[in-house]
Amino acid sequence: MKLLALLSLLILMLQEARTASLSEEREGDPYAILHLGDYVLSLDNYDEVIDPSNYDELIDYGDQLPQVKGTSLASLTRTRFTQSTEAARTLPSNPTTARPPTLGLLAAPANHGLPTCLICVCLGSSVYCDDADLENIPPLPQTTAYLYARFNRISHIRAGDFKGLTKLKRIDLSGNSISSIDDKALRLLPALRDLILPENKLVALPTLPTSIEVLDVRMNRLQSSGIQPEAFRALEKLQFLYLADNLLDAIPPSLPLSLRSLHLQNNMIETMQRDAFCDAEEHRHTRRPLEDIRLDGNPINLSLFPSAYFCLPRLPTGRFV
């Protein structure tokens, strides 16, 4: 009986020793109890999108979720997500934007919806819009003094195209298709000196500002009926008048004494008034500034009208036989 008790005690001691040995082995190797065979990775549903609104249904937290004033964390998360979703749905489909800043020197948008100084080249007080496929005069900066918009498709100059441009000195619209100019488009430009409009389709001249010094309307379709009888009388600063290659049948009357150069070649002029250039009653008067008159390319015979140009320092260029 004592032997049986001794054997039982020995077996119990061996089991205790074995258990202690296993515990020490597991504490030395934390991965000893990790069996990778128990973990299976499935790629079939790897790209499945998890909806956060029912996230607490996918994972059962049980009693582990903390309570926030009687509301579970999962419920609170779902509530906030729902509120943010509803807020996103109520955003306006066409949100309003703030008014863009004023363009200043860039000027307002032109034909292409861009500011003028992005379509044209603005250098100081000069604006260059040559060959820019423009159909109208673009809005210009208020400081513009020189405008070059040559070789475009401009067909009409409107009354307000140059409104407020009190510093504008030169307009060059050569090589467009301008057929008409509103009468008020130019006359209110106090600083305008040079108006350059050759190679257009003008049939008449508008009222011009008294500040004009150079007027170039060569190669248009101007007729004598399209020039008012007193069109040039008040232009006391006009020095250069170029009317060549038009459809004129008479020399414009009332030319100012300031005129230095008059080009009328290649028109349809057949006759000349006695007072076209000189005062028939004042034989001692000499019109010295007017030294350059061209009438070549016209059917007129200048030798038939000597009294019309006796006061000139030089004979006009043209046919005398």
Swiss-Prot record:
One of its GO terms (cellular component) is extracellular matrix. The modification Sulfotyrosine is found at Y61. O-glycosylated (sialylated oligosaccharides). Sulfated on tyrosine residues. The gene is OPTC. Gene3D superfamilies: Ribonuclease Inhibitor. Homodimer. Inhibits angiogenesis in the vitreous humor of the eye, and therefore represses neovascularization. Binds collagen fibrils. May be involved in collagen fiber organization via regulation of other members of the small leucine-rich repeat proteoglycan superfamily. InterPro entries: Leu-rich_rpt (IPR001611), Leu-rich_rpt_typical-subtyp (IPR003591), LRR_dom_sf (IPR032675), Mimecan/Epiphycan/Opticin (IPR043547). Coiled coil: none annotated. This is Opticin. Disulfide bonds join C278-C311. The record marks A20, S21, G104, L105, P109, A110 as: Cleavage. The keyword Ribosomal protein does not apply. Residues 105-142 form the LRRNT domain. LRR repeats lie at residues 143-164, 167-188, 191-212, 237-258, 259-279, 289-309. GO terms for biological process: angiogenesis; articular cartilage development; bone development; collagen fibril organization; negative regulation of angiogenesis. It is found in: Secreted, Extracellular space, Extracellular matrix. Glycans are attached at N301. Belongs to the small leucine-rich proteoglycan (SLRP) family. SLRP class III subfamily. Residues 1-19 form the signal peptide.
